[in-house]
Amino acid sequence: RKRGLGVLRSIKELYCHYFVFGQTLIDKVAMKAGLEKQYNYQFDNYERFLEILNSGQGVVMIGAHVGCWEAGAGFFGAYGKKINIVMLDAEHQQIKDVIEGNAKEEKNYNVIPLNQNIIDAMLQMKVALNNGEYICFTGDRFIGTDNTILIDFLGSKALFPKGLFQIAAKCRVPVVFYYSMR
């Protein structure tokens, strides 16, 4: 209704959404099964992205809950030892259990859980960035609205977290936006 679509068009859009979500789940299983070489990859601004990753400095990477981040695993294999994923503590344990239970090899990333001790998480992020590592966030998820900014996004107002950019600015590291889609 928010998009002003009729009933039939809304049903079609919902079906397409579920279809793409199903493809994403299949991609996740395929990546965990070691089939990443069966996929073809296409990148936007690939040379600039590699230039930033190879610079030796820390990088803040911002993704979204869209597509399948595991689809990028083939690309990030060489860079994986330097990846730190920042996530909510409750999700951390659930995701850790799923990944460790299904992974065919050892994980190639570190998780920085956000919990009641936000200072500890911030210090871990600072250490990682100072060591030339990458910290990855999902930019479409935040707690509360105190540290957000309201901007126009795809024709509507949307809240986005400011903290990700503040961390990058304070640590003087570049920000890279990343997503992978089928």
PLM ranges: what are they?
Residues 1-60, 67:
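Membrane-proximal helical "anchor" segments flanking the first transmembrane region
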Residues 50, 74, 126, 165-166:
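Alpha-helical segments flanking ligand/cofactor-binding loops in enzyme cores
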Residues 23-24, 100, 139-140:
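Short, flexible segments with low predicted structural confidence
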Residues 6-9, 13-16, 55-116, 131, ...:
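Catalytic core of membrane glycerolipid acyltransferases/transacylases, capturing the structured
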Residues 48, 120-125:
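Short acidic active-site motifs
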Residues 39-41, 47, 64, 148-152, ...:
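Flexible, active-site-adjacent loop/turn segments at secondary-structure boundaries
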Residues 81-84, 127-182:
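Membrane-associated lipid acylation/remodeling enzymes share a hydrophobic transmembrane-juxtamembrane segment
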